[in-house]
């Protein structure tokens, strides 16, 4: 009996390690090649297909140099002001988010860095479970070990959700403002950054008071952050 238990545990461990190697292999490949899709994109494609089998995501990759510096600053100011300083985890930000959530009695702040958000988007589902958070941490370590900050940020800007079926800076710029990502103004960039936490809602509530208030805050902060 004990022998079978040991074999079962060994088999599970082997599968776990193989899965991590599969993820690591993709990260190494994406260091030089652009992702065609992500786990989160696939999840949203399936959701849209439930009501419209012909639905397609709006996703267009653009190189880092073709994305407005205004948007880069706005995203860092909004999502991860210490992006260039940490190695994947902002422990002070995590503690602050934890305290806010305890105070409110519900999840109102995440504390996830740009690297953590990218890890989740590339490989994981949107379900919140302890396993997913642990796997997200492992993937974040891999991303930071393999890629430099510029590449992490380039992929992030191209794959995050910015509306219902809208992914990446280029598609978002054209969807909301009918301009390429390279031509976004400071105000437009700040508003796009403010939408990131809840993009599908803000896609249909573009004059929401909370969104407009956060946009102004980001505009005040964005010129004081460093970007890759």
From Swiss-Prot:
<keyword id="KW-0328">Glycosyltransferase</keyword>
<dbReference type="GO" id="GO:0009274">
    <property type="term" value="C:peptidoglycan-based cell wall"/>
</dbReference>
<keyword id="KW-0472">Membrane</keyword>
<dbReference type="GO" id="GO:0008955">
    <property type="term" value="F:peptidoglycan glycosyltransferase activity"/>
</dbReference>
<keyword id="KW-0573">Peptidoglycan synthesis</keyword>
<dbReference type="InterPro" id="IPR036950">
    <property type="entry name" value="PBP_transglycosylase"/>
</dbReference>
<comment type="similarity">
    <text>Belongs to the glycosyltransferase 51 family.</text>
</comment>
<dbReference type="GO" id="GO:0009252">
    <property type="term" value="P:peptidoglycan biosynthetic process"/>
</dbReference>
<dbReference type="GO" id="GO:0005886">
    <property type="term" value="C:plasma membrane"/>
</dbReference>
<dbReference type="GO" id="GO:0008360">
    <property type="term" value="P:regulation of cell shape"/>
</dbReference>
<protein>
    <recommendedName>
        <fullName>Biosynthetic peptidoglycan transglycosylase</fullName>
        <ecNumber>2.4.99.28</ecNumber>
    </recommendedName>
</protein>
<keyword id="KW-0133">Cell shape</keyword>
<keyword id="KW-0808">Transferase</keyword>
<dbReference type="InterPro" id="IPR001264">
    <property type="entry name" value="Glyco_trans_51"/>
</dbReference>
<dbReference type="InterPro" id="IPR011812">
    <property type="entry name" value="Pep_trsgly"/>
</dbReference>
<keyword id="KW-0961">Cell wall biogenesis/degradation</keyword>
<comment type="function">
    <text>Peptidoglycan polymerase that catalyzes glycan chain elongation from lipid-linked precursors.</text>
</comment>
<feature type="transmembrane region" description="Helical">
    <location>
        <begin position="8"/>
        <end position="28"/>
    </location>
</feature>
<dbReference type="InterPro" id="IPR023346">
    <property type="entry name" value="Lysozyme-like_dom_sf"/>
</dbReference>
<dbReference type="GO" id="GO:0016763">
    <property type="term" value="F:pentosyltransferase activity"/>
</dbReference>
<dbReference type="Pfam" id="PF00912">
    <property type="entry name" value="Transgly"/>
</dbReference>
<comment type="pathway">
    <text>Cell wall biogenesis; peptidoglycan biosynthesis.</text>
</comment>
<keyword id="KW-0812">Transmembrane</keyword>
<keyword id="KW-1133">Transmembrane helix</keyword>
<keyword id="KW-1003">Cell membrane</keyword>
<dbReference type="GO" id="GO:0071555">
    <property type="term" value="P:cell wall organization"/>
</dbReference>
<keyword id="KW-0997">Cell inner membrane</keyword>
